[in-house]
Amino acid sequence: MPPPPEDEAIAHKGHFYGVYLLCSQSLDSRYRAKCYVGFTVNPKRRIKQHNRGCDFGGAKKTSKKGPWQMVMIVHGFPNNISALQFEWAWQQPTLSTRLKIFPDLKRKKPKETHFDYNFRILNRMLSVGPWHRLALTIRWLETDYERAFDLPIPCHMEIVSGKVSISASQRKLEEATGTAPPVAWAHECHLCMQSIEQPERSRLGCTNPTCRLTCHMLCLASYLLGDEPGQYIPIGGECLLCETRLSWSALLQRKRLQLGVPEEMQDNEEEDLSDDGPDVDSDVEVQEFSD
């Protein structure tokens, strides 16, 4: 497989969950500029399936209504369930209990395009829980559609441009994201000063490879939560040794990769990335988590 272009991000196979927005480029005025929201673990393969039709793994709602462009994708979800919850709410903003505080989402505004309406829904979603605490990446895939959000998004989220490639290579991922483990570990937790039992599973450190920060997972989580009463999952914070900015989701992602534990592959993801195996979007009802 040829290496990805230099401006293309690399995500690890089995750990990527994305919710994307398609826009139709159909010459038929009935379908042109219509939008579709879906879930994928492999963006490149998914857009090919949509454009080939439902007989090749595409969705019924997009079949024969293209060609389609995948104009943006939101990723960084901790698991497929979280991503599917997000997809469902984006598809059904009037049914989502979390979006009822935004009555303006009930319908498209006059002269508002389908893309603008879906972008407005996304903007509101990123400002409410549980999504506003996730370290999500909003990735523009087509520069013609790029625009600024009306409501500011949380500062721990990223807005980037460029394609994303799925790789099974641990070396490629470490080179692209700097997820290599620290040069050395301490024997005791820097926070509670107790020894760490089963370090392979319960130990976390800094993302700076030259930093020797060594902590119990729960100790570091409590430290990063700081003065956030009522919260159980941290967003991030500064390393207590080197002051590197830490992302909790990035720390957990690195731990999974070090353990070699793949996440569940949604919709029977095939081993061969070139294979057109099923990658079906969730047309079935997905229930929201209760508060």
From Swiss-Prot:
One example GO MF annotation: 5'-flap endonuclease activity
Coiled-coil residue spans = none
> Per the entry, which co-factors are needed?
a divalent metal cation
Instruction: State the Pfam families in the record.
Output: GIY-YIG, SLX1_C
Where mainly found?
nucleus
Primary enzyme class: hydrolase
Domain (GIY-YIG): give its ranges.
15-101
Tell me which EC number(s) this protein carries: 3.1.-.-
Q: How does this chain assemble?
A: Forms a heterodimer with mus312/SLX4.
Question: What family is reported?
Answer: Belongs to the SLX1 family.
Q: What name is this protein filed under?
A: Structure-specific endonuclease subunit SLX1 homolog
Q: Which organism is it from?
A: Drosophila pseudoobscura pseudoobscura (Fruit fly)
